Amino acid sequence: MTNDTQTTNTETTDTYIPSPSDWVREQVETIEATGDTRSVDIMGLPVVLLTMRGKKTGALRKVPLMRVEHDGVYAAVASKGGAPEHPQWYANLLANPTLTLMDGTASWDAVAREITGEEREQWWARCVQAFPNYAEYQTNTDRTIPVLLLEPVSAG
């Protein structure tokens, strides 16, 4: 089988590349089979599904994340369980901030934007309220865990 299409950082492809992580891949497969993010959870808590473009390949990448929502805006917390490095999806969203967000059976286009300062502090409190382990994750790493807002793209 040959691949006649090559992709650079600025090109995109509709090819979906599953995660190398077993649990991520299995959760994505379950969500896609059921058409509903409520078919899976992380530690008993609800998730949303982000579909984005890979930074290096431009291919579609999918990741389930903890559901943190306030007034129709969602947050994505790049905690990676308090690991010393950021998750790959964070680099993907910085490079290609447009994404599709799925919550339950609904999905829509959104744009990711990293937040800092007072805005981050306000959202960080919401994130910790939604998933208290985030506070512990922050104490386990020297990096400031990034928070990105996933703001809906208005139609029109």
What do these predicted ranges mean?
Residues 44-79:
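Short beta-strand segments
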Residues 3, 150, 156:
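Accessory terminal regions of nucleic-acid processing enzymes
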